[in-house]
Regions:
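Short loop/turn motifs at secondary-structure junctions
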Residues: 1-2, 132
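Active-site HxH/HxHxD metal-binding segment of metal-dependent hydrolases
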Residues: 2-73, 155-159
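Metallo-beta-lactamase
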Residues: 50, 54, 74-79, 84-166, ...
């Protein structure tokens, strides 16, 4: 049984909505068929509402460290700003759903309205501190493989190799 929808950030390719001449079905279409909460970071809730058209009451605002139990599955929300102010990842046991924060070979864009390079650096450093055997499931597959362990990603992803904020700013 479906009990909720998790949103990594407000961009239409992740929650549905319109951008330019394109429309992506997403949570608003889902809510036409079933009533359930849409979990979005508190800083992202207005953006989700704006692009999807769902009501403020339909959004359950969460913050970093909040947990959601679905049956015996514990989902932890991790605030990872940078791509957007309220970007978040979901951690389920030893799996990380990273949205547009972290890809196998890259990270989310930081040249878009609302993005922030320094926040992205801190978010990536935070994710890099998770155990190496964490399975990474990114929001897009721009790599030869759709998933990898965080340890493998740390060895190959240039953005995770940078440990100095000044070097990061030059990327």
């Amino acid at each position: 049984q479906l009990t909720g929808a998790l949103v990594t950030h407000y961009h239409p390719d992740h929650c549905g909505g319109s951008f330019g001449q394109n429309t992506v079905e997403g949570v608003s279409r889902l809510l036409e068929h079933v009533s359930l909460p849409v979990y979005a970071h508190e800083l992202e809730a207005d953006g989700v509402r704006r692009v999807t058209g769902i009501s403020e009451q339909g959004i359950k605002k969460v913050t970093s460290g909040d947990k959601l139990m679905v049956g015996d599955i514990d989902i932890e929300f991790l605030h990872t700003p940078g791509h957007t102010p309220g970007s978040q990842c979901f951690r389920v046991k030893n799996t990380l759903v990273s949205g547009d924060t972290l890809f196998i070979d890259g990270c989310g864009r930081v040249d878009l309205p609302g993005s922030d390079t320094e926040d992205m650096f801190r978010s990536l450093q935070r994710l890099a501190s998770l155990p190496d055997d964490t399975l990474l499931l990114p929001g897009h597959n721009y790599s030869a493989v759709p998933h990898a362990t965080l340890g493998e990603t740390k060895r190959t992803n240039t953005y995770l190799k940078i440990k100095d904020p000044e070097t990061w700013k030059m990327m």
